């Protein structure tokens, strides 16, 4: 069974930048906190959507469902009546980096070429060869993944999926898997980590300015609009 790997990306927010904007547009502390919480939720949902698309594109995943299972957003909203600058709501994105099944990825499947059976030079009889020793090959469409081959494997449609299947020593077969953690970690750094702060600040500023312009206030104890 493939190793279970994960990567959790935390939102790194510059609190001083939030406070600077609050003072600049004359927003209240609670308006800032409400805008912060809403921006956090919007950022988590936005980056989840972007992450799924990033996984599909970077790994050439066949179906959206397989990619969606690899991204989980977690948002912890704190009570605004108890929040301080050092105790704000938090969010993170969890990425599953364990191996993908071959059938989940786009690419070329190839059975091994039939091996010419050798003959005994003295008798002319065919010599025995190890059945299935040579393996099938998978060439991923994604440039971030390398071609792979598995000993004693073959290409066939089993259990509703055309893939590379490996013969097990104990009997039976299992589907071959492709390691993706390195390619995914690079994509996460390139697509997500570099942009998450900018996306959050865009949502935060938009929301906070709207609250100030509309004179929107909330009760710090109930969180209800006044």
Labelled PLM ranges:
Residues 1-226:
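Short, Lys/Arg-rich flexible segments
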């Amino acid at each position: 069974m493939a190793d279970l790997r994960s990567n959790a990306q935390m939102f790194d927010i510059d609190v001083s930048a939030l406070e600077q904007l609050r003072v600049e547009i004359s927003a209240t502390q609670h308006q800032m906190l409400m805008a912060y919480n809403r921006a956090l939720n919007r950022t988590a949902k936005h980056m989840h959507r972007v992450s799924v698309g990033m996984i599909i594109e970077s790994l050439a995943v066949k179906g959206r469902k397989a990619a969606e299972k690899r991204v989980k957003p977690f948002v912890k909203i704190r009570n605004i009546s108890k929040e301080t600058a050092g105790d704000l709501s938090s969010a993170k994105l969890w990425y599953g980096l364990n191996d993908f099944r071959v059938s989940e990825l786009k690419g070329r499947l190839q059975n091994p070429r039939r091996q010419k059976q050798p003959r005994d030079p003295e008798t002319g009889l065919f010599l025995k060869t190890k059945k299935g020793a040579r393996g099938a090959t998978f060439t991923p469409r994604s440039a971030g993944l390398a071609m792979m081959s598995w000993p004693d494997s073959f290409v066939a449609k089993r259990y509703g999926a055309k893939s590379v299947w490996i013969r097990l020593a104990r009997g039976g077969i299992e589907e071959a898997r492709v390691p993706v953690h390195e390619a995914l970690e690079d994509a996460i750094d390139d697509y997500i980590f570099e942009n998450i702060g900018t996306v959050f600040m865009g949502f935060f500023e938009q929301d906070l300015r709207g609250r100030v312009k509309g004179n929107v206030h909330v009760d710090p104890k109930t969180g209800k609009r006044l």
